[in-house]
Amino acid sequence: FFDLKDKKLNILEIGIQYGSSLVLWNEYFKNSIIYGIDNTDFIKDRLDTYPRIKTIIQDAYRKELTFNLPLFDIIIDDGPHTLESQIKFINNYFKKLNKNGKLFIEDIDGKYNSNELRKEASKFTDNITSIDFRSNTNTEDSLMLVIQNDLDAHYLVT
């Protein structure tokens, strides 16, 4: 992210739990607006002290939620890490990417889910990269998928 550090970006993370990663993004991307969506509000008061962090307390995987969101440059799925939620993430949020924006899906469980998610993402783009951390972590849920939008957002059907 070094080349993006000083740019004005819209960044969204789904699954914010204690809010630590939003605070990290807020500190690193000094000119960006950071959005976080979670279905629990126990951390919202703490995050309200950061003017560039916007929190939304809802089910992030409901398509209706995305209608009123702006376009983003980076969208990270750190939600429940289920195949079902990750497929919904691709289908609901790819359309919310600016040109060259990227979706990041963390903690993908095993090769089977990676193949399923690649298949789903290929409906939108061929620019899909897998990052495999399994040899470093010795667990099966250490795959990440990066999906990039190569189209101008206004060409995407909502």
Where are the model-predicted features located?
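A short alpha-helical cap/connector motif
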Residues: 1-105, 109-158
